[in-house]
A protein has these predicted regions:
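Catalytic Zn2+-binding segment of zinc metalloproteases
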Residues: 157-174
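N-terminal low-structure segments adjacent to metalloprotease catalytic domains
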Residues: 2-70
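Short pre-active-site segment immediately N-terminal to the catalytic Zn-binding motif
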Residues: 137-154, 176-178
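Active-site metal-coordination segments of metallo-dependent hydrolases
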Residues: 81-89, 174-187
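Active-site or metal-binding loop neighborhoods of secreted/extracellular toxin and effector enzymes
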Residues: 178-207
Length: 207
């Protein structure tokens, strides 16, 4: 499937899944007996059982995960044809106690690919993406973060670690099912690094 078609399909399927999780419970009370809500952009009541509806949304979720995996792989392969750089040495030194060598050796980065970053705003359900990790290539929106933001690097390297541990398909499946559970450990590490880098003031540590 061409990249643009896969991107459009994933956006449509993701929208449907999001609408289901946001509106399914209210819609269930509005449907007549013997009918179930089907929500893809809008909700309609159709004949069927709760099991039929659950199976339908499992298929929707599978399609969404497949679309995300396709976007990740195709975007990464396109980026791999362009110049990328290893982790800056001072960033690597700062984080080497927190990651296995495989993560630090695998990860590379580049700066300012707007097509990838803007797509990630939608596909990764994040309104303001400052960096995105595509398997082993991290794309930063601005060079200052790439060169000096150790906390953001920690966040993105956590995703490199997840790709290595789970594989791309499983990463996409987990992210589609519950993106917060995938992002949570990355944000936790990012916040921890930020706090360690914040000097204590005369009145005590900054909260």
């Amino acid at each position: 499937m061409p990249f643009t078609a896969a991107l459009r399909l994933f956006r449509q399927v993701l929208l449907g899944a999001a609408c289901f999780y946001a509106t399914a419970a209210p819609a269930q009370t509005a449907c007549p007996p013997g009918e179930q809500p089907i929500c893809l952009g809008v909700c309609v009541c159709l004949p069927g059982s709760p099991r039929d509806t659950e199976a339908f949304y499992e298929q929707v979720q599978w399609l969404a995960a497949a679309g995300l995996e396709t976007w990740i792989r195709q975007s990464r392969d396109r980026l791999a044809l362009q110049e990328s750089r290893p982790i800056p040495l001072h960033i690597r030194s700062q984080l080497e106690s927190r990651f296995d060598l495989a993560v630090l050796e695998t990860a590379r980065y580049r700066v300012g690919d707007d097509a990838v970053l803007n797509a990630a705003n939608t596909l990764l359900q994040h309104p303001d993406v400052t960096a995105v990790t595509l398997i082993d290539i991290i794309v930063f929106r601005n060079e200052a973060d790439a060169l000096d933001n150790g906390a953001l690097w920690a966040h993105e390297l956590k995703h490199v670690e997840q790709y290595l541990q789970w594989g791309v398909g499983e990463f996409a499946r987990r992210y589609t099912r519950d993106h917060r559970s995938v992002e949570r450990p990355a944000y936790a590490l990012q916040i921890q690094i930020e706090r360690e880098q914040t000097p204590a003031t005369a009145t005590g540590p900054r909260q």
